[in-house]
């Protein structure tokens, strides 16, 4: 279960609460999309499904083919899954524990669950996508929020200068 949760978090860049609120009805496997329209929170000891963090958090995300296949396989493993059942009936603490365990076993530094979202945005920046396109995908309210991730690529400035040198010599 945690494997699939972490796959969605990384490859779609969604928030932890958005992940924990997902139901089968949020997936369109023909179109390979994932609809984000709610969020999970624990308030006063009770599980609560709320509206997303911001207006732009309501969105449809295109999933990569391999992730779409993985999630279809995951659904086949879930017994008695209803269209409105949470597909990850976990707490945020359970995700955090799973991440800590996975990091320890693999010998890497422990990261926060939210760092998977940062990594997704960073990957898309590195792939050359615009801040606007990335912001729309991850539900950022403004492009300025997406620009906060620019510091994650310190070599970009050097690469730019190198490419400008090549351009000038042509």
Regions found by a protein language model. Give the residues of each.
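Basic, Lys/Arg- and aromatic-enriched nucleic-acid-binding interface segment
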Residues: 1-16, 20-22, 30, 66, ...
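Short basic/aromatic active-site micro-motif
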Residues: 90-91, 109-128
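Catalytic-site neighborhood detector that most strongly recognizes the C-terminal catalytic loop/helix
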Residues: 40, 131, 138-163
């Amino acid at each position: 279960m945690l494997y699939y949760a972490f796959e969605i978090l990384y490859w779609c860049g969604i928030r932890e609460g958005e992940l924990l609120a997902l139901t089968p009805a949020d997936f369109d496997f023909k179109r390979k999309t994932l609809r984000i329209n709610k969020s999970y929170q624990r308030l006063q000891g009770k599980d609560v499904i709320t509206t997303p963090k911001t207006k732009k958090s309501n969105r449809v995300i295109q999933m990569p083919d391999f992730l779409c296949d993985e999630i279809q396989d995951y659904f086949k493993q879930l017994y008695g899954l209803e269209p409105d059942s949470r597909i990850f009936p976990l707490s945020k603490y359970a995700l955090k524990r799973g991440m800590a365990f996975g990091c320890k076993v693999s010998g890497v530094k422990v990261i926060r669950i939210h760092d998977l979202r940062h990594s997704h945005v960073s990957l898309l920046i590195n792939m050359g996508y615009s801040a606007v396109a990335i912001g729309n995908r991850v539900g950022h309210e403004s492009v300025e929020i997406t620009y906060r991730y620019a510091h994650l690529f310190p070599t970009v400035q050097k690469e730019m200068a190198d490419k400008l040198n090549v351009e000038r010599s042509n």
